[in-house]
Amino acid sequence: MTSGELKRAKRAVRRRVLAARDATDPADRQRAGAAVAERVLALPEVVAATTVLAFSSFGSELSTLPLIDALVGRGVVVGLPVIVDGDLVGRSWRPGEPTTETWFGAHEPVGGDVIDPSAIDVIVTPAVAVDPAGRRVGYGGGFYDRFLPRTRADAFRVAVVLPEQLVREELPAGAFDLRVHAIVTPDEVIRCAP
């Protein structure tokens, strides 16, 4: 598949899956966030983690606040992504600390310490769509594709999604697209072999 074909294929997946996700009820997304948090918090990799890069959900994404609240309650250092000069950087954040809204709707910490990518034990990755093999289609900015190779090889990557975002067909992926190790929905945990 050429790079142009790959971009077109991913764009088609984004359109289809985002339409399905956008049609979900906001109250269901809040409940899904709590259920997903419970499942993620039980994963052995997360239980052992001291530093987690999460993300601040926006739009029709499931709520990540229950997960972030619980991690902070456990004493885990939680970071949120910040885009600096086109690159993703993790900055520490605790609920209640100030954030600023980005041009695409996500919230980034205003302050917070920069987290060394090698210190991150778990990366909670956003995804528009994922397949059972751990391939993910993001929003198209390539931020995580550039960031993930800078993390440790043993850093655990987990995608948290609504059931509508878990697709059964093989998603389009290029050589630079790193897979996630696990997918968590409100109903299940899928272990992948990236």
What function would you assign to each model-found segment?
Residues G140:
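Short polar/charged helix/loop
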Residues T2-A119:
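N-terminal active-site beta-alpha-beta segment that forms phosphate/nucleotide-binding
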Residues F58-S60, V128-P132:
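Short glycine-rich anion-binding loops that position phosphate/pyrophosphate groups of nucleotides
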Residues M1-R8, A12, A19-A23, R74, ...:
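Surface-exposed, charge/polar-rich loops and edge strands
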